[in-house]
């Protein structure tokens, strides 16, 4: 009765209710093999269809609800017409391959049926049913059979790499900064004399205690002094320079609409991140910020610069472009100049641009220079741009994060071609999500994206060949867990704070240890645990030894079963045709877009005709084309980069490349290592170069004096004879000591000799 009316009836005392046992899916996934765990995840995704996908939690109160930092910039970017993405091309090729495999299998089954025409009809029906079931299983599951799963579920072996203990010859020379930065360890944000709007923003962002670099920098920055600070990545440098700058702007409001603060950053993504943090810190005050980085719309940036924002965050190239082509924009009113990641900006092609920007800035300014490592170039820049700077050294960037677990996989000699197979095995079997894979070149990153995508993994890529929209979209998808693996070059190795990165894999060892520390610094950030796995060949053993020597925690060597590597190597060889097919689709699409663009321009010219307005003047630059060409040639790594010199060399290189054809796996790996070695060689040459002569010697920071070792006094013949001091004379008269006599084997000499005192004589009586 109650059930008919729609009511829930009560349970009686005598009734037994079946309670389903609770299972923890996460525990099951960890215990079971990872290949099978992938299927369970797919089933769980299908189960989530019971819930309404449109359901959204209510937004947090306040202007900034902790949403993604780059979402605003991504919305501003112009979205091009929907062309097929790389993932769509990969999916198309995968489907084509699957249909071909099915057709081949169905052809085999038909032949078997023809061979067994004389069999009973019941047996035929059973065979048909089995074939249908098998095909359904193949569609739902991955491409692996039960035999493959037995190989794939073999466990890797881990060994602890012990470093060879050697006697220390002496303390190594430290960096340029002395480790004597005085700051109050108990200092809080409330004790820093910051304005209420800033304290409110700090609380809204969830900051509780300042980091060491913030405790050291903010009080000095508020005094208006120049700062030369050295701190590792992920230590809160952005807030360390943003808070004193914002406090200065609030305390001293502007009289005229001018830009007063300039922040220079090396990469676009880091610029967007700094802009986002600054905007959030200034959310409760009327300070305006502007972002001028490459890849974004030039016209909208020019309009924003005409409005004279208080703070400008820019990359060097785009800033110089605006300075030479935007008439109303200048840097003569800059009060504070901030150089973030200065060592990175002077590493490659920014040196001349940095000098040009500093030349155009106001001379009466406060300058803050932040650098992870202090090179000679940074030192030169500091001597030119800073006036009586306060040197702050909190922590060097030569150490990895404390909770990072470092693992290395040895690549045997003549086995360099196994790198792709090993990476694929790691990503398919062990590290399935929240992984960053670093490669040396853009070409290899693109290839790994295609290869892993064809294996059915959710992959994205991030490198310099992509447009700004594609780069930000890849970061957004990785952050939102739409993709599990992000393949990147060193563009993503600096400054980017990507939440939840569990594992970093190095396809090859990077150029220097400094680059290695930056790469593995993407994980184990802010006290979290993380893991790095690096593939090390014979030519990279020297760097491995240095890393093991510097490591505080034990370093482990991971050994993959040979069966697994061979299995994935065979699979990659079979996929080469599919990789080529995806690359062909990309090339065709590029040609189509190019021809469409030419047709559109021709149509526009025909429509406008002679009445067309004069074209816009070309954008000027501080260097001529020849000067830029010379600079590129000087910094080129190898011969094909030197093709910039002329058409003949370029044609010659292209002919040789066509003759060779497609590179093998061994050649690709060697090419990656070669690039890293050439960079390291160039760096070594630069370090050997004679330093610039100066009229006045620079003030070197006073290094901590080395501990004096107790020197054993050695007797010297001439010194004993010529030393006429009171102490030496007394020692000479006393003769050798008891210990010296013992060493020389002399008998113990009684001081008194045979002389008997009166007291002794009296006792005998």
Swiss-Prot record:
Biased composition (Basic residues): 685-694, 744-765
Motif Q motif location, chain numbering: 187-215
Acidic residues composition-biased segments: 13-32
GO biological process: rRNA processing
Biased amino acid composition, Basic and acidic residues: 98-119
Compartments where located: Nucleus, Nucleolus; Chromosome
Catalysed reactions, as listed in the record: ATP + H2O = ADP + phosphate + H(+)
GO CC annotations, alphabetized: chromosome; nucleolus
Motif DEAD box in this chain: 340-343
Sequence positions bearing Phosphoserine: 25, 48, 135, 146
Domains as described in the record: The C-terminal domain regulates nucleolar localization.
The family this protein is said to belong to: Belongs to the DEAD box helicase family. DDX27/DRS1 subfamily.
Protein name per its UniProtKB record: Probable ATP-dependent RNA helicase DDX27
Protein species of origin: Bos taurus (Bovine)
């Amino acid at each position: 009765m109650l059930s008919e009316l729609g009511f829930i009836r009560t349970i009686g005392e005598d009734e037994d209710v079946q309670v389903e046992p609770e299972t923890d899916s996460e525990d099951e996934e960890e215990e079971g093999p990872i290949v099978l765990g992938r299927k369970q995840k797919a089933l769980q995704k299908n189960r989530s269809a019971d819930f309404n996908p449109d359901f959204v939690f209510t937004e947090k109160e306040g202007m900034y609800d902790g949403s993604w930092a780059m979402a605003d910039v991504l919305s501003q970017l112009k979205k091009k017409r929907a062309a097929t993405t790389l993932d769509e091309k990969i999916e198309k090729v995968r489907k084509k391959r699957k249909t071909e495999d099915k057709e081949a299998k169905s052809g085999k089954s038909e032949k078997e049926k023809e061979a067994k025409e004389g069999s009973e009809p019941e047996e035929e029906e059973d065979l048909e049913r089995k074939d249908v079931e098998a095909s359904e299983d193949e569609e739902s599951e991955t491409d692996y059979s039960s035999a493959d799963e037995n190989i794939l579920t073999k466990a890797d072996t881990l060994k602890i790499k012990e470093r060879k203990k050697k006697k220390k010859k002496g303390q190594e020379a430290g960096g340029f900064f002395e480790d004597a930065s005085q700051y109050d360890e108990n200092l809080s944000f409330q004790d820093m004399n910051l304005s209420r709007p800033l304290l409110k923003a700090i609380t809204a962002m969830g900051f509780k205690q300042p980091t060491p670099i913030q405790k050291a920098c903010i009080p000095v920055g508020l005094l208006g002094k120049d700062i030369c600070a050295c701190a590792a990545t992920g230590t809160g440098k952005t807030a360390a320079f943003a808070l004193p700058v914002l406090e200065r702007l609030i305390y001293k409001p502007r009289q005229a609409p001018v830009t007063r603060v300039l922040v220079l950053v090396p990469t676009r993504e880091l610029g967007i991140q700094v802009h986002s943090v600054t905007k959030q810190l200034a959310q409760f005050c009327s300070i305006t910020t502007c972002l001028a980085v490459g890849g974004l719309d030039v016209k909208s940036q020019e309009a924003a610069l005409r409005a004279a924002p208080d703070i400008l965050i820019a990359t060097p190239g785009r800033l110089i472009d605006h300075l030479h082509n935007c008439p109303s924009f200048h840097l003569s009113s800059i009060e504070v100049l901030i150089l973030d990641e200065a060592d990175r900006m002077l590493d490659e092609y920014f040196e001349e641009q940095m000098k040009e920007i500093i030349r155009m800035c106001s001379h009466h300014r406060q300058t803050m220079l932040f650098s992870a490592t202090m090179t000679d170039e940074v030192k030169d820049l500091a001597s030119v741009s800073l006036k009586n700077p306060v040197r702050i050294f909190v922590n060097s960037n030569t150490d990895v994060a404390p909770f990072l677990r470092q693992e290395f996989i040895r690549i045997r000699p003549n086995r360099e071609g196994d790198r792709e197979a090993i990476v694929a095995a790691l990503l398919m079997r062990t590290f399935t999500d929240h992984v960053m894979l670093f490669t040396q070149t853009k070409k290899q990153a693109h290839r790994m994206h295609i290869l892993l995508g064809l294996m059915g993994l959710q992959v994205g890529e991030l490198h310099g060949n992509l447009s700004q929209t594609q780069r930000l979209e890849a970061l957004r998808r990785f952050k939102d867990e739409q993709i599990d693996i992000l393949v990147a070059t060193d563009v993503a190795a600096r400054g980017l704070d990507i939440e939840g990165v569990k594992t970093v894999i190095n396809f090859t060892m990077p150029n220097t240890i400094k680059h290695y520390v930056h790469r593995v610094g993407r994980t184990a950030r802010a006290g979290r645990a993380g893991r790095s796995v690096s593939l090390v060949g014979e030519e990279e053993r020297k760097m491995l030894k240095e890393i093991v020597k510097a490591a505080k925690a034990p370093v482990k060597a991971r050994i993959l079963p040979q069966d697994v590597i061979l299995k994935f190597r065979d699979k990659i060889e079979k996929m080469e045709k599919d990789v080529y097919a995806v690359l062909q689709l990309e090339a065709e699409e590029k040609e189509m877009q190019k021809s469409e663009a030419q047709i559109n321009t021709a149509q526009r010219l025909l429509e406008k005709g002679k009445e067309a307005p004069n074209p816009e003047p070309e954008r000027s630059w501080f260097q001529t084309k020849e000067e830029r060409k010379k600079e590129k040639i000087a910094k080129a790594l190898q011969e094909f980069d030197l093709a910039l010199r002329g058409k003949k060399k370029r044609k010659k290189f292209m002919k040789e490349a066509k003759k060779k054809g497609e590179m093998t796996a061994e050649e690709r790996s060697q090419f990656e290592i070669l690039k890293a070695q050439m960079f390291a060689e160039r760096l070594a040459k630069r370090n050997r170069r004679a330093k610039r002569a100066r009229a006045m010697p620079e003030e070197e920071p006073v290094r901590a004096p080395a501990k004096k070792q107790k020197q054993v006094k050695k007797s010297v013949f001439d010194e004993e004879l010529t030393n006429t001091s009171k102490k030496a004379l007394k020692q000479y008269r006393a003769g050798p000591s008891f210990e010296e006599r013992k060493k020389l084997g002399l008998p113990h000499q009684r001081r008194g000799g045979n002389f008997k005192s009166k007291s002794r004589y009296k006792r005998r009586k």
